[in-house]
Amino acid sequence: MTESNKQKEEQMTFEEAMKGLEEIVGKLEEGDVPLEQAIHYFQEGMTLSKLCHEKLQHVEKQMDFILKEDGELAPFSVKEADSGDK
């Protein structure tokens, strides 16, 4: 992968990557793709899949944190409230 392709990939949104992945899957499902082109599509699809996975992981990490009142990031945890029914 060239440096310019890598930069384009990094700037791609999750939605753009998913759309590209869906287009590739559609082309491969048609079945009228020469082997060499199918391999190229597969490689491109795996790259887009990895990009989507990385973007989702990044968002999950962001969601693990909430803003404290003083503006600092703090881990978010859910504590069960005592119901007092003991």
UniProtKB/Swiss-Prot annotation:
Q: Which class of enzymes does this protein belong to?
A: hydrolase
Q: One MF term in GO for this entry?
A: exodeoxyribonuclease VII activity
Q: What is this protein called?
A: Exodeoxyribonuclease 7 small subunit
| Cystine pairs | none
**Main localisation, per the record?**
cytoplasm
Tell me what organism the protein belongs to: Bacillus pumilus (strain SAFR-032)
A Gene Ontology cellular component where this protein is annotated is: exodeoxyribonuclease VII complex
- EC numbers: 3.1.11.6
